[in-house]
């Protein structure tokens, strides 16, 4: 199966499995999710990223030993993705790099949407000259803010602001947007490609999984 | 539907539709294929590429007017892909760039396999530091050569040569390899990811098509 790493600690099974469940529903591949220990707030600065890196590697190595054929680090910042690749022999996919390379396949100007202050470095590096602007929906600091009618309107308004500046593709820099189905809302309202980070990691991971299974 | 451009002129319906048929079978999306006029030998040098470019743009524009939601230039050299993007508003996917970005999502050293003398520039540019070596199976100058048992052995031998040099992903620089099912043979023999150019363009094109259809 696919091993999916959540980079925040949770005992809530629904939260733990939400990305894996989406990938199973979209691509009909088995996903085993697990999370790193002792970081209930996840990764939010350099210090917490340094703290998480060896835990991500340890969990990925364990998942490989457990039989996972493809690993996914399900976070738009791609934490420890390069490091994990040096420690396992199975393919390792990061949400941020998968989404950004998918945008590059389209080759049009990109607007990035997220809820943090800045775009993950890995995404800026990959998007390069296609990157136009980053935006955070007004008043939104948590994905649950987007579940209200007002939050939804703010997300659509933010996407429209990006489009006014010439972007033709939207990329999410937040895996929380996947859980609330924001991509579907924006696609319906605006009729432009929206690259959802969990959809992108799942698209490539499920393709590799099927290959390596001999399907 | 998806509009798929073949960059060689053919009156043979089987040849014309072979990439579209593969994409339909793999991803269950409708594909309309058409080819550029008056180039039965396709693109094989700078002069024939210059000759083909305006024909690709004209065909792509016609396909967009005809209702195609996504266009695919089904050639590993990505001819006229950037030019076509400036002339239509729908997404344009190139086989070479889609396959190369897909390899970058995996992030491991890449070996490229093809039947021409050199790797398309667009693929080298994208693969960058991940590119290790290009190889052409010995004695193979035409994809039909690979349909013989000897040709098949040569392709497997070429892949093994790449792996001995440390590559962990194989990317095809020839869409003819898709038609003969070479990826499946190599995956079975060698158990490493093989990025097939038609599979890669179809993976992204079908995803975008479904998005823009509101699925």
Regions found by a protein language model. Give the residues of each.
Chain A
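Short, high-confidence coil segments that cap the C-terminus of an alpha-helix
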Residues: 63, 68-69, 107-108, 167, ...
């Amino acid at each position: 199966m696919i091993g999916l790493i959540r980079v925040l600690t949770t005992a809530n099974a629904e939260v733990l499995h939400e990305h894996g469940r989406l990938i199973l529903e979209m691509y009909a591949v088995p996903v085993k999710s697990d999370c790193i220990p002792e970081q209930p707030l996840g990764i939010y600065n350099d210090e917490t990223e340094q703290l998480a890196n060896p835990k991500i590697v340890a969990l990925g190595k364990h998942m490989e030993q457990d039989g996972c054929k493809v690993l996914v680090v399900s976070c738009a910042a791609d934490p420890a993705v390069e490091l994990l690749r040096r420690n396992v022999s199975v393919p390792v996919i990061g949400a941020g790099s998968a989404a950004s390379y998918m945008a590059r396949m389209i080759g049009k100007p990109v607007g990035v949407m997220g809820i943090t202050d800045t775009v993950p470095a890995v995404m800026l590096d990959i998007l390069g000259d296609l990157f136009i602007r980053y935006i955070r929906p007004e008043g939104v600091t948590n994905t649950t803010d987007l579940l209200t009618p007002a939050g939804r309107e703010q997300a659509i308004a933010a996407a429209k602001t990006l489009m006014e500046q010439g972007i033709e593709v939207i990329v999410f820099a937040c895996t929380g947007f996947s859980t609330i189905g924001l991509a579907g809302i924006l696609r319906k309202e605006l009729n432009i490609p929206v690259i959802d980070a969990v959809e992108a990691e799942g698209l490539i991971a499920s393709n590799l999984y099927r290959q390596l299974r001999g399907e």
